């Protein structure tokens, strides 16, 4: 980083990678003129694990447990993108019941992600009480996940052609009860936070992003919608069964940290609407397309070799990726999560390029914090909502 040429004595401060407000192993080299930020340089890569290269040496079903380690607070979305790509390459039809259950799980995961953004964001700017409130509601969401998938996090629930298991007995009633309860809690959040004058002083007019600027930087998700651009892939691409439900895109015009907070808060209410409609209209039928497990062994006799008969040596793939390329995307809680996938007629992807929303959204941070106060860095970074697992991959 070049030191700005000025007549003043500037101070260079390292924030992170262990600072609690960095939300992971993010390091910021901040140049200060007193309390004013002159420059900021993010240093990434502390959590890089080579996720794209690992994908090239795994069958899709083997790779599914890895993808939940990208954004480990919204694992359903990383699983969804991992199975949606091969499904589109192979023209695999997903049963309607499986599609509805996927939507329910995705929206519950969106609520859990937004809740775990809200608590630490409020703690960053000095409000401790909401931090404990959101963990109470988040526990209910994780109880639902545990009942349906067996895991509170890292669910490993999605499969090519459907899901791993059907919903257990009594789960739908339990989820409907949670929806009714959670709507009342969102009203409590609004009373506790939205009208708080100290909170408004910290976030209003801080980190403003214009609509054109947001598009030029490639921002997505609440970062884009808070800048006056009503763009949501659930409406644009109509993946899964989102076009069968009535809900509205939540967006704001101001483009500041308060607008991003309001977008995420109202998105949780819209997610509850989608979940309630999906639960009430949940169709019957199978939860998985079993034909997707078929594999043409005549075309590749190598898979019949002796070593492939033992899973400890070489596991035989159960799905073949056709020789074509595809970009597939979903609307994750943090923005557009995309995969550029290239198949080459084998069980392993030839290329697996990840488009993480947090990494793209983080690029605008140096522009937002310049000419702001040092204390505003926590507010702006918190409003972006990043998880270093998906930023570094």
From Swiss-Prot:
Q: What does this protein do?
A: NDH shuttles electrons from NAD(P)H:plastoquinone, via FMN and iron-sulfur (Fe-S) centers, to quinones in the photosynthetic chain and possibly in a chloroplast respiratory chain. The immediate electron acceptor for the enzyme in this species is believed to be plastoquinone. Couples the redox reaction to proton translocation, and thus conserves the redox energy in a proton gradient.
Q: How does it sit in the membrane?
A: Peripheral membrane protein
EC number(s) stated in the UniProt entry for this protein = 7.1.1.-
Task: List the GO biological process terms.
Answer: photosynthesis, light reaction
| UniProt cross-references to NCBIfam families, sorted A to Z | PRK06075.1, PRK07415.1
Recite the UniProt keywords alphabetically.
Chloroplast, Membrane, NAD, NADP, Plastid, Plastoquinone, Quinone, Thylakoid, Translocase, Transport
For this UniProt entry, the molecular function terms from Gene Ontology, in alphabetical order, are: NAD binding; oxidoreductase activity, acting on NAD(P)H, quinone or similar compound as acceptor; quinone binding
What SUPFAM superfamilies does the record point to? HydB/Nqo4-like (SSF56762)
| CC per GO annotation | chloroplast thylakoid membrane
Similarity section = Belongs to the complex I 49 kDa subunit family.
Compartments reported by the entry: Plastid, Chloroplast thylakoid membrane
Asked if the Swiss-Prot or TrEMBL record annotates the protein with the keyword Transport, the reply is: yes
Q: What class of enzyme is it?
A: translocase
PROSITE patterns the record matches: COMPLEX1_49K
What's the catalysed reaction? a plastoquinone + NADH + (n+1) H(+)(in) = a plastoquinol + NAD(+) + n H(+)(out); a plastoquinone + NADPH + (n+1) H(+)(in) = a plastoquinol + NADP(+) + n H(+)(out)
Quaternary structure, per UniProt, is: NDH is composed of at least 16 different subunits, 5 of which are encoded in the nucleus.
Listed name of the protein: NAD(P)H-quinone oxidoreductase subunit H, chloroplastic
């Amino acid at each position: 980083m070049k030191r700005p040429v000025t007549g003043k004595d500037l101070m260079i401060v390292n924030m992170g990678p262990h600072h609690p407000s960095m939300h992971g192993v993010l390091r910021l080299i901040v140049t200060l003129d007193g309390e004013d930020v002159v420059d900021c340089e993010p240093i990434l890569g502390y959590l890089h694990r080579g996720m794209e290269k690992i994908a090239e040496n795994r069958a899709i079903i083997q790779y599914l447990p890895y993808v939940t380690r990208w954004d480990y607070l919204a694992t359903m979305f990383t699983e969804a993108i991992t199975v949606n790509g091969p499904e589109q390459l192979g023209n695999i039809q997903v049963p309607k019941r499986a599609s509805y259950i996927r939507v329910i799980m995705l929206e519950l995961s969106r609520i859990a992600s937004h809740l775990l953004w809200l608590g630490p964001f409020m703690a960053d700017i000095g409000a401790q009480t909401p931090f404990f409130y959101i963990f109470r509601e988040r526990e209910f969401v994780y109880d639902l996940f545990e009942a349906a998938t067996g895991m509170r996090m890292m669910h490993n629930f999605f499969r090519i052609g459907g899901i791993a298991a059907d919903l257990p007995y009594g789960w739908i009633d339990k989820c409907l009860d949670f929806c009714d309860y959670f709507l009342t809690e969102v009203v409590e959040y609004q009373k506790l936070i939205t009208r708080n004058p100290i909170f408004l002083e910290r976030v209003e007019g801080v980190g403003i992003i214009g609509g054109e600027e947001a598009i030029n930087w490639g921002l997505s998700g609440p970062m884009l919608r808070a800048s006056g651009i009503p763009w949501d892939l659930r409406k644009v691409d109509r993946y899964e069964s989102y076009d069968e439900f009535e809900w509205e895109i939540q967006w704001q015009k101001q483009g500041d940290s308060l607008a991003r907070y309001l977008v995420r808060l109202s998105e949780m209410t819209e997610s509850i609407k989608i979940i309630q409609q999906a639960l009430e209209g949940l169709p019957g039928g199978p939860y998985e397309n079993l034909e997707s497990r078929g594999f043409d062994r005549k075309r590749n006799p190598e898979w019949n070799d002796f070593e492939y008969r033992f899973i400890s040596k070489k596991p035989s793939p159960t799905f073949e990726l056709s020789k074509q390329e595809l970009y597939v995307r979903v609307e994750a809680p943090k923005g557009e999560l995309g995969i550029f996938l290239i198949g080459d007629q084998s069980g392993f992807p030839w290329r697996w390029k990840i488009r993480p929303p947090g990494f793209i959204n983080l690029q605008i941070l140096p522009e937002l914090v310049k000419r702001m106060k040092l204390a505003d860095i926590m507010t702006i970074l918190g409003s972006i909502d990043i998880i270093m697992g998906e930023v570094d991959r």
